[in-house]
Swiss-Prot record:
GO terms for cellular component: cytoplasm. Reversibly transfers an adenylyl group from ATP to 4'-phosphopantetheine, yielding dephospho-CoA (dPCoA) and pyrophosphate. Its cofactor is Mg(2+). Disulfide bonds: none annotated. It comes from Limosilactobacillus reuteri (strain DSM 20016) (Lactobacillus reuteri). Substrate binds at residues 9, 41, 73, 87. GO terms for biological process: coenzyme A biosynthetic process. InterPro entries: Cyt_trans-like, PPAT, Rossmann-like_a/b/a_fold. The lineage of its organism: Bacteria, Bacillati, Bacillota, Bacilli, Lactobacillales. This is Phosphopantetheine adenylyltransferase. One of its GO terms (molecular function) is pantetheine-phosphate adenylyltransferase activity. The gene is coaD. Signal peptide: none annotated. ATP binds at residues 9-10, 17, 88-90, 98, 123-129.
Length: 173
């Protein structure tokens, strides 16, 4: 059985991520989407929220599971019996970074095989960080997000704006 892990922070999951998940689910018998913690990215959603959002977005893909973990991806792969690490590449910068990560993973576990998927042209410019930046400045990014995640993002940004206004009002008193 071909089992793969697709790790990422997915904050938020984009249509580019979802496309990779669909393509991976067609290639592998089982695909585990691993929602990782990366506090340096200043997460908009909690890990639990991201897991729930992704589960909803992939609900039609029977061979896809959504899990969360901390620590080394190769350790996760060993725990769940995965032989393949799935990664998406948007550009040469991604390739250089992912090549180095793949080499380190292979050093840590010589059974870890990284499989690269090239992003489709319509998704090559996307990143969760860019989408958060655009939407926080008032831009409409709904064309790049699954519907459930677009709604969650709108709600979260509205909550943050209301909190900011409340703090500003308290300072003005």
């Amino acid at each position: 059985m071909k089992v793969a892990v697709f790790p990422g922070s997915f904050d938020p999951l984009t249509l580019g991520h979802l496309d990779l998940i669909k393509r991976g689910s067609a290639l592998f018998d089982q695909l585990a989407v691993a929602v990782m913690t990366n506090e340096s990215k200043n997460p908009l959603f909690t890990v639990e929220e991201r897991v729930a959002q992704i589960k909803e977005a992939v609900s039609g893909l029977d061979n896809v599971s959504v899990i969360t973990t901390e620590g080394l991806t190769v350790d996760l792969m060993n725990r769940i019996g995965a032989d393949y690490l799935m990664r998406g590449l948007r550009n040469t910068t991604d390739f250089q970074y992912e090549r180095d990560i793949a080499a380190m993973n292979n050093f840590l576990d010589d059974q870890c095989e990284t499989v690269f998927f090239l992003a489709k042209p319509e998704y090559q410019h996307l990143s969760s960080s860019l989408l958060k930046e655009v939407t926080s400045a008032g831009g409409d990014i709904s064309a790049y997000l699954p519907a459930n995640i677009n709604e969650a993002l709108k709600k979260r940004l509205m909550e943050r704006e209301m909190l900011r206004v409340k703090k500003d009002n308290e300072k003005a008193r």
